Amino acid sequence: MIRQRTLKNMIWGTGIGLHSGKKVYIGLRPAPVNTGIVFHRSDIEGGAWIKADPLHVVDTRLSTNIGDGHIRVGTVEHLMSALAGLGIDNAYVDLDGPEVPIMDGSAAPFVFLIQCAGIEEQNAPKRFIRITKPLKAEDGDRWVQLEPFEGFKVSFAIDFDHPVMKNGGQEVTVDFARTSYLKEVARARTFGFMREVEALRRMGLALGGNLDNAIVVDDYRVLNEEGLRYTNEFVRHKVLDSIGDLYLLGHPLVGHFSGHKAGHALNNSLLRALLLRQDAWEFVDYAERRAPFSFADTLVTASA
């Protein structure tokens, strides 16, 4: 059977919050089977815990933020994407602030931390959510949908009237039975427009954003000296974000997710609709030889 996974060891890192601009320490720790991904705010007296769950999403302005009562954890999507890409089912995430650090704006630093900690298979079957009926959420010309598919595939399209984005391509499909999350998705960085920076900061957003943790474009070009990591890095990052948002379900998906000009808000609307439509999905597990796609197998050991 395909087994659940956790971290082999605890590991720590540090960075700044994209929106808060504050330094944050992050720790990733092993967790027992069927725990899921649970965030721990160590800066709150007595500690405060909140599980990654679509129903805990409280804000989707430029990032996915979860909350439960007075507890908030912001910008969870890049870390969640890395956990999904490496097949981590169970982990505790310790934070001494209100936001997951942005690192370099992609999922790659979180992938690196997880790889350094090591990955351990646990003695319990990994449960997948298999999509059995199509489901769609839309807002004007923006939409996201899930369809039955024996594997995991993500398609996304953006539509920005910008020369760099037009030249690089604004559509992509990634079939994870045929290619690697680590190669095709993990290094794609978040992006923003220089003309919007001041307005965002007046709203208390993007206070920690800079050329080290985001692609920044003016009206004509990319301002980062190193340029792009992929010619279509902008739309690949939307794939990265979507994978992170989808993983709030707590289980890997078997199905085809597609999106058009969408973002975190529609992703969450789709997940909430899915949870209400129990006829549109089912829990499944797989023997190794029958798995419709595989996860990265770097540094994986088996637990006793």
Curated annotation (Swiss-Prot):
Its cofactor is Zn(2+). Disulfide bonds: none annotated. This is UDP-3-O-acyl-N-acetylglucosamine deacetylase. Belongs to the LpxC family. Keywords: Hydrolase, Lipid A biosynthesis, Lipid biosynthesis, Lipid metabolism, Metal-binding, Zinc. The active site is at 264 (proton donor). Its EC number is 3.5.1.108. The keyword GTP-binding does not apply. It holds the Pfam family LpxC. Pathway: Glycolipid biosynthesis; lipid IV(A) biosynthesis; lipid IV(A) from (3R)-3-hydroxytetradecanoyl-[acyl-carrier-protein] and UDP-N-acetyl-alpha-D-glucosamine: step 2/6. It comes from Acidithiobacillus ferrooxidans (strain ATCC 23270 / DSM 14882 / CIP 104768 / NCIMB 8455). Catalyzes the hydrolysis of UDP-3-O-myristoyl-N-acetylglucosamine to form UDP-3-O-myristoylglucosamine and acetate, the committed step in lipid A biosynthesis. One of its GO terms (cellular component) is membrane. SUPFAM superfamilies: Ribosomal protein S5 domain 2-like (SSF54211).
